[in-house]
């Protein structure tokens, strides 16, 4: 019986020791878990959140920026605004067309010069050119149908335009022999007169075969002399 009691006591001691070992293992496991959890928390706190890295774009308030000036660098902002030559001259050409009316000349009444009339007008214009002298740049321009009917476009001599006339589109004033003035639009790239030339042509009843002498009396002003092709017949009387 004593032996049985001794065995029971040993068994109880073994169970107690085993229980204590299990509890000790549990405590170590819990400590280990807490350690890893703490490390994970520290690591996650040290890394910036992807959501935080993204910069939130400020939302513009309704109506904001409508009256605000365009932001530019100081160097660009201080530069003068470029003049809008094309817009200005388009408006100018419209005004010229309105002032002289929009109707085309009746092409059924076209006048066709004979070779004799044409030669006479050119020779008379060249004589006048010599009389006027070389104090001002000057050239002679015989009139064709395209100059005085239909298109009303007057091309100017290339060499003269390159040497004396503006390098960009500009208003050129024509002064006739009565000192009446007519504004025309000079197109630098095409080297000719556009808007306003039609009005000058109609006002002076220019026809095919007439010959004009252009004398540049100012940078953008021509004195214009007209030799009529019809004068050929007057010389025969």
From Swiss-Prot:
Q: What GO cellular-component annotations does this UniProt entry give? A: nucleus
**Keyword annotations of the record:** DNA-binding, Nucleus, Transcription, Transcription regulation
**InterPro entries reported for this sequence:** B3_DNA-bd (IPR003340), DNA-bd_pseudobarrel_sf (IPR015300), REM16-like (IPR044837)
A molecular function annotated in GO for this UniProt entry is: DNA binding
- Which SUPFAM superfamilies does the entry link to? DNA-binding pseudobarrel domain (SSF101936)
Where is the protein found, in the record's own terms?
Nucleus
Q: Tell me the segments the record calls region Disordered.
A: 1-23, 38-82
Task: Identify the DNA-binding region of this protein by residue numbers.
Answer: 139-230
Chief location: nucleus
- From the Swiss-Prot or TrEMBL record, give the protein name: B3 domain-containing protein Os06g0194400
> Which species does this protein come from?
Oryza sativa subsp. japonica (Rice)
């Amino acid at each position: 019986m004593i032996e049985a009691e001794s065995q029971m006591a040993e068994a109880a001691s073994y169970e107690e020791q085993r229980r204590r070992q299990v509890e000790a293992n549990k405590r170590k496991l819990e400590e280990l878990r807490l350690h890893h959890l703490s490390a994970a928390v520290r690591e996650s706190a040290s890394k910036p959140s992807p959501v935080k890295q993204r910069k939130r774009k400020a939302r513009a308030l309704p109506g904001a920026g409508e009256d605000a000036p365009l932001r530019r660098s100081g160097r660009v902002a201080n530069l003068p605004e470029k003049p809008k030559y094309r817009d200005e001259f388009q408006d100018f050409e419209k005004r010229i067309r309105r002032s002289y009316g929009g109707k085309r000349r009746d092409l059924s009444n076209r006048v066709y010069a004979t070779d004799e009339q044409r030669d006479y007008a050119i020779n008379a214009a060249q004589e006048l050119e010599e009389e006027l002298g070389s104090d001002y740049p000057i050239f002679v321009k015989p009139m064709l149908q395209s100059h005085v009917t239909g298109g009303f476009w007057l091309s100017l001599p290339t060499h003269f335009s390159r040497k004396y006339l503006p390098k960009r589109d500009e208003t050129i004033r024509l002064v006739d022999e009565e000192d009446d003035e007519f504004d025309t639009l000079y197109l630098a790239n095409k080297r000719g007169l556009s808007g306003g030339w039609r009005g000058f042509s109609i006002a002076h009843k220019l026809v095919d075969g007439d010959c004009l002498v252009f004398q540049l009396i100012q940078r953008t002003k021509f004195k214009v002399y007209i030799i009529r092709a019809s004068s050929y017949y007057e010389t025969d009387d």
